[in-house]
Amino acid sequence: MIAWLDPQDPFPPVDEALGPDSEAPGLLAASRDLSPQRLLLAYRQGIFPWYSSGQPVLWWSTDPRMVLAPPALRVSLNLRKTLRRVLRDADWEIRVDDDFLAVMRACATTPRDGQDGTWITDDIIAAYGTLHRNGMAHSVESWYRGERVGGLYGVALGRMFFGESMFAHRTDASKIALAALCAFLGNHGVAMIDCQQETDHLASLGARPIPRAEFVAHVRAATALPAISPWRFDKSVLERWAGTPAAPAG
């Protein structure tokens, strides 16, 4: 059994989440409350929401937890070549928070292999939109010739980033945004990006699973640090991966 949370209820301890032999490993609690306050309380404890339309809000704390250290991003030869083009070509732009809600909607509507529908419901978009307006959620976007072709979004608390979803409408466009995010976060002393659940795709990008207890301890320490401000991106931060100077602006 899992806990049902009324709006005033705290989360149960994360070690009470369902175990690996259950039908839903990592499931901790359920509620109808998806307020920004509930979301912030969840993230600071290593908990995230994931549910389908028509279900109550389901809260998870998986063990192990998939994380990506920004310096560990695995840049393939093809992606490295793409990043060099991005740096040299003024047709390519990396924008931060150009249109956060548009990125969320693109993540919700972009078809994915093996996935029917989306967990990014209207309620999710509204709740994370509020976090964004309060400076606690951000998007990183790949633009080509004035068109948004890829991007990602997540929650930023202190020196911790919780990745939520990404999309690509052009080859490697989401990976370009991820490389930009890793470069930006690395420059600001962020040691870990939360990737939530273990998948082969995330592993191919350099993410790795760590014990939940280790993850939660890191989250508590990192979210207590000062927040990154402002969120501004310059192409030159990608030079650490691509090794090619960015073209001058103008």
UniProtKB/Swiss-Prot annotation:
Any one GO CC term of the record: cytoplasm
UniProt keyword Transcription, yes or no: no
Gene Ontology terms: biological process: protein catabolic process
InterPro entries in the record: Acyl_CoA_acyltransferase, Leu/Phe-tRNA_Trfase, Leu/Phe-tRNA_Trfase_C, Leu/Phe-tRNA_Trfase_N
Highest rank taxon of the organism: Bacteria
GO molecular function: leucyl-tRNA--protein transferase activity
Major place of residence: cytoplasm
Catalytic reaction annotation: N-terminal L-lysyl-[protein] + L-leucyl-tRNA(Leu) = N-terminal L-leucyl-L-lysyl-[protein] + tRNA(Leu) + H(+); N-terminal L-arginyl-[protein] + L-leucyl-tRNA(Leu) = N-terminal L-leucyl-L-arginyl-[protein] + tRNA(Leu) + H(+); L-phenylalanyl-tRNA(Phe) + an N-terminal L-alpha-aminoacyl-[protein] = an N-terminal L-phenylalanyl-L-alpha-aminoacyl-[protein] + tRNA(Phe)
Pfam families, sorted: Leu_Phe_trans
Group of enzyme by EC: transferase
Keywords for this protein: Acyltransferase, Cytoplasm, Transferase
Gene3D superfamilies: Leucyl/phenylalanyl-tRNA-protein transferase, C-terminal domain, Leucyl/phenylalanyl-tRNA-protein transferase, N-terminal domain
Enzyme Commission number(s) of this protein: 2.3.2.6
Function (record text): Functions in the N-end rule pathway of protein degradation where it conjugates Leu, Phe and, less efficiently, Met from aminoacyl-tRNAs to the N-termini of proteins containing an N-terminal arginine or lysine.
Protein name: Leucyl/phenylalanyl-tRNA--protein transferase
